[in-house]
A protein has these predicted regions:
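Short, well-ordered turn and helix-capping elements at secondary-structure junctions
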Residues: 34, 104-106, 147
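Active-site nucleotide/adenylate-binding loops and adjacent lid/helix of ATP-dependent enzymes
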Residues: 108-152
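ATP-binding N-terminal substructure of ATP-dependent carboxylate-amine bond-forming enzymes
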Residues: 1-102
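Surface-exposed loop/turn and secondary-structure junction residues enriched for glycine/proline
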Residues: 54, 103-104, 111-114
Length: 152
């Protein structure tokens, strides 16, 4: 089974690569890519095959790159490991020839924005932590960037 993981300098990608490398029941070949030269990021040395990718901000070039790797390596599954890639793949899902599993573009875009996602969940009567407008009376607060994958 040929599995492609991109953005392999990231912690998410490294974790997925490590998990895939432990699978012994199937013959898993991990194909990785990133904008860096091989050896400039740890993930490039942990995959079976490595390709240098164009920046994800060059959308059409990046989609073409994915399709070329799919054709060359006969990719069975692409695992998106970053928010940016998830948004891009959902946006161009009909143009990407590789199999991947993601929600539709509207849903991925909504949940990329933590404030909009929280408001949508509240509107549908789903309990979520409250949003604080005034932090002076709060004892403990978790700060979260609106468009990121982590908290402070």
């Amino acid at each position: 089974m040929n599995i492609q993981i991109n953005n392999i300098h990231s912690t998410n990608s490294l974790s997925v690569i490590k998990v895939l490398s432990r699978i012994k029941k199937y013959d898993v070949v991990v194909i990785g890519s990133d904008i860096y030269e091989k050896g400039e990021c740890a993930g490039s040395l942990l995959v079976d095959k490595y390709y240098r990718a164009p920046p994800i901000t060059h959308e059409s070039e990046y989609i073409n790159f994915l399709n070329e790797i799919n054709e060359k390596e006969n990719i069975d599954l692409l695992i998106p490991a970053s928010d940016a890639e998830a948004v891009l793949l959902s946006k161009y899902s009909t143009q990407v020839k590789t199999k991947f599993f993601l929600a539709d573009y509207e849903t991925v875009s909504l949940f990329k924005d933590k404030l909009k996602a929280t408001q949508a969940l509240m509107k549908n009567n789903i309990k979520v932590p409250r949003i604080c407008d005034n932090l002076f009376n709060e004892k403990k607060v978790i700060f979260r960037k609106r468009n990121s994958v982590n908290s402070m």
